[in-house]
Swiss-Prot record:
GN (gene name): rlmE
The enzyme's E.C. designation: 2.1.1.166
The family this protein is said to belong to: Belongs to the class I-like SAM-binding methyltransferase superfamily. RNA methyltransferase RlmE family.
Enzyme superclass (EC): transferase
Chain intervals with Basic and acidic residues compositional bias: 8-17
Organism listed in the record: Polaromonas sp. (strain JS666 / ATCC BAA-500)
An example molecular function term from Gene Ontology annotations: rRNA (uridine-2'-O-)-methyltransferase activity
InterPro entries attached to this UniProt entry: RNA_methyltr_RlmE, RNA_MeTrfase_FtsJ_dom, rRNA-MeTfrase_E, SAM-dependent_MTases_sf
Keywords recorded for this protein, A-Z: Cytoplasm, Methyltransferase, rRNA processing, S-adenosyl-L-methionine, Transferase
Protein name from the UniProt record: Ribosomal RNA large subunit methyltransferase E
GO cellular component annotations of the record: cytoplasm
Length: 247
């Protein structure tokens, strides 16, 4: 999810009427790397909408996050690669088309093409009325369903001003943590995307204060030249508890 949609380097090259020579080189290099990226090719082969699916796949396979019957909330779900991966994990082997052993709810400001079995809410996660829609989606005849797993690929539109960008990133992660505290099962898990830099240590401290186990991860599908990383928090805890790291 992009809180304010931001252009990719490809979009910038296409939409900008004037591109500097240096900018053209950067965009050409990005396009070359993207086209030849093994995860891009694998995503196309396996039917995923984005290479990001393999980031979640590695995290899941390393930590065993997704289990049959789980209720999963995907924050920043567009274009849908993470929801696709969860959808496949929750489909029983040999199941008929459309059969799903669990629940998946995606949320994003941007529209998302439908995925069978995935409920989607379009809206800004920061807005109370959008959170209310998410609450309603979790409601059943027996009351509110507690969530097993919250996955967040939310990211703000970066301005290039480090202090402002850091504050936006911190705010989104704080909202994801607050949602997990309010709607997740005590033994549930939260996975968030964030970036090394200003505000990173603050978010690690927040996770340590909130979860029994905290694990920073940089999946192989995250580009090596990117500051992107992920934090995994397992098991909600009381503030007084200490937090070990996963080995």
């Amino acid at each position: 999810m992009k809180v304010n949609p931001k252009n990719s380097p490809k979009d910038n090259l296409k939409d900008s009427p004037k591109v500097s020579a240096r900018g053209k080189k950067v965009n050409k290099a990005w396009l070359h790397d993207h086209i030849n990226d093994p995860y891009v090719k694998l995503a196309q082969k396996e039917g995923y909408r984005a290479r990001a699916a393999y980031k979640l796949k590695e995290i899941d396979e390393t930590l065993g996050l997704i289990k049959p019957g789980d209720c999963v909330v995907d924050l920043g779900s567009t274009p849908g690669a993470w929801s696709q991966y969860v959808r496949r994990k929750l489909s029983p082997t040999g199941a008929a088309a459309g059969e799903l052993n669990g629940r998946i709810i995606g949320l994003d400001m941007l529209p998302m093409e439908p995925i069978e079995g995935v409920a989607f809410i379009q809206g800004d996660f920061r807005e109370p009325e959008v959170l209310q829609k998410l609450e309603q989606a979790l409601a059943t005849d027996k009351g509110q369903v507690k969530v097993d797993l919250v996955i967040s690929d939310m990211a703000p539109n970066l301005s290039g001003i480090e202090s402002a960008d850091a504050a936006r990133i911190v705010h989104l992660v704080e909202l994801a943590v607050e949602f997990a505290q309010n709607r997740m099962k005590p033994d549930g898990t939260l996975v968030v995307k964030l970036f090394h830099g200003s505000g990173y240590d603050e978010l690690v401290k927040l996770f340590r204060a909130t979860f029994k186990v905290v694990k920073p991860m940089k999946p192989k599908a995250s580009r090596s030249n990117s500051s992107e990383t992920f934090l995994v928090g397992k098991g909600l805890k009381k503030r007084a508890e200490t937090v070990p790291e996963l080995a």
